[in-house]
Amino acid sequence: MPHPDGDLDRRIELLTAQIIAARKAYYQENTSLMSDVEYDALEHELKDAEHAKGFSDRNSPSLTVGIAAQLNLFEPVKHIEPMLSLDNVFSLDQLHSWYEKTKKICPEGDQCTFVCELKIDGVGVSLRYANGYLISAATRGDGAIGEDITQNMLYVPSIPPRIALPGIFEIRGEAFIKRDEFDRINQLSLERSKQFANPRNFVSGCIRTKTPNMRYLESISFYAHGFTQVYGYTSGGMNLHSDITASGGVKTEIEHGMFSAYSRLSECKIPVNSYNRLCTNFSEIESYIENIRLNRQCVPYAIDGIVVKIDSLQKQALLGSTTKAPRWAVAYKFPSESTVTRLLDIEVSVGRTGRVTPYAVLQPIQLDGSEVSRATLHNQKVIGDKDLLIGDYVRIRKAGDIVPEVLCALPEKRDGSEVLFKMPSLCPSCGAELMPSKLGDIDLRCPNMQSCLVQLAGRLEYIGSRGVLDIAYLAEENAYALSHLRKFGKSAEVQLFKITIDDLVALEFMYKGNMRSPFRKKGDSFPGFEEPTKSAQDMVDSIERAKRSPLWKFLLALNIRHIGPASAKALADHFGSIESIINAKIDELLKVRSLGETIAISVHDWFRDPWRVELVNTWRSDGALFGD
């Protein structure tokens, strides 16, 4: 049944907000809000909805890539040509359809060749060389403007600071870490409260930081997968016929093809993947994919598919690109792999909004190149629907090759010792009685938002994140420590803008004293100095800067349930001040574009709690401007 226009508009706005939030988390906060499969499904649904509407905004996620660079942290770098994404296909039939359509660019009787490459699960990087010297390295950003990460990328051993090619080139490629290197670093990080979640997030965090860790950066690798030049061919072309022996290179006459260009780049010491293959028909492409699929675990780094490109640079130029992706390339995504392990226990965690989420404690097992020992189970209904008992053998997979997921139980392996799981009735953190937020809700929540220390620590961590108030070093460990500091404790959130250097010196994570840290192994300690660290000063400076954040970011910082970046911006634009939002009635909130009844009620009810109004008033009196 077709959507009424109003419903379709609201659905498009919701999908847009979800996709932008996921991109921001992925590209700026080095984390994942959802699996690749879930994200791809959102993008496909948005395209379908816009098609049904007969219109798409030029800034729609369906027509754009990445997310705007964080120019408050990094200098901007304008790419010579847009650094685009790739369209995805999820079956060989879809890939064959793309192949047949793309092959039509080739004249009758002219062989059309394709390059097959591994789709490495890393971070896209653009390297700019001028007359042989590396002058900048940048992230993808929004495809047009990226973030300057040159100083960090200079530590990556496989990136040459000088190459034997004249002129100005941008080399596009993937920064990644090999599995054994990632495992080695995680072994060296046992003193941390938690290890790095996955290789991709590790790489993103390493190259997108103002405080680089040389040891970590030296573990990162790079492979080139594209290039462009200020002059000569565009859309992936550079004049590789040039006689460059004067620059120390080897004179090589080649056709203007991607595969032969890779060979030329390799001669110039630019790393190129040895798994790249030239294919002359679809049967060869299919064989390549099957061979990689069967031997995927032999590849020393994480991959999630195969990229297929037309080889001819001239034909690439003829096919061109959309605003989001080239028409001459596509990514075939592998189905998620699965394996069997034991469900040892089911435990629960408490989130920043009070939601209590069960998760599976698994017999540790290797899956797709990394050890898996935990997987979310969402809620009691999911556990029941999947017929899970503690002690079961279960089949698991990585959804989107990242997030561990329990698919089902294997009841035929039961021996009678299995135990039924029941959600706890009390909060494991504060002891409050758990309950649904409203009649009919599946999720249980801890209603003690003001005093539950786990919720408080989660809110502080969220407040400090890059997408909210961007407070340096206010991450998980530090948020936990603040919420347990005797001076603040349960009022740490309210007193956030009162924090001083002296307060941070009292925290072990900011103090170079000989106190044992709760986040380190027994017996570990800090060196014996008694002055605040640079980290402490950076954090205090960040708190001061955060006072001048725009109103919509403060709305996020208040941790109002259901409020994301899109709805926060809509509220800020509509009302203009925090006081107007506090005093707004539900019918006034419903007039805000893209706000439905659920969000309107959530915002209205949030400001009816006296302690939350006190939070706003205290922040205001402590210098927070709320966008004024």
UniProtKB/Swiss-Prot annotation:
Catalytic activity field:
NAD(+) + (deoxyribonucleotide)n-3'-hydroxyl + 5'-phospho-(deoxyribonucleotide)m = (deoxyribonucleotide)n+m + AMP + beta-nicotinamide D-nucleotide
Q: Please give the cofactor(s) recorded in the UniProt entry for this protein.
A: Mg(2+); Mn(2+)
Q: Which GO terms describe its molecular function?
A: DNA ligase (NAD+) activity; metal ion binding
Keywords, sorted A to Z: DNA damage, DNA repair, DNA replication, Ligase, Magnesium, Manganese, Metal-binding, NAD, Zinc
Report the active site residues. K119
**Which enzyme class, named as a word?**
ligase
Would the keyword Heme turn up in this protein's UniProt record?
no
Give the EC number.
Answer: 6.5.1.2
Q: Name one GO cellular component term.
A: cytosol
Matching entries from SUPFAM superfamilies are given as:
DNA ligase/mRNA capping enzyme, catalytic domain, Nucleic acid-binding proteins, RuvA domain 2-like
Amino-acid positions noted as binding NAD(+) in the UniProt annotation, renumbered to this chain? D36, V37, E38, Y39, D40, S85, L86, E117, R140, E174, K309, K333
The cross-references to CDD domains, in alphabetical order and at most eight, read: LIGANc (cd00114)
Write down the superkingdom of origin.
Answer: Bacteria
Q: Where does Zn(2+) bind?
A: C427, C430, C446, C452
What role does this protein play?
DNA ligase that catalyzes the formation of phosphodiester linkages between 5'-phosphoryl and 3'-hydroxyl groups in double-stranded DNA using NAD as a coenzyme and as the energy source for the reaction. It is essential for DNA replication and repair of damaged DNA.
PANTHER family linked: CHROMOSOME TRANSMISSION FIDELITY FACTOR 18 (PTHR23389), DNA LIGASE (PTHR23389:SF9)
HAMAP family annotated for this entry? Answer: DNA_ligase_A
Protein family membership: Belongs to the NAD-dependent DNA ligase family. LigA subfamily.
- Output this protein's name: DNA ligase
Organismal lineage: Bacteria, Bacillati, Actinomycetota, Actinomycetes, Micrococcales
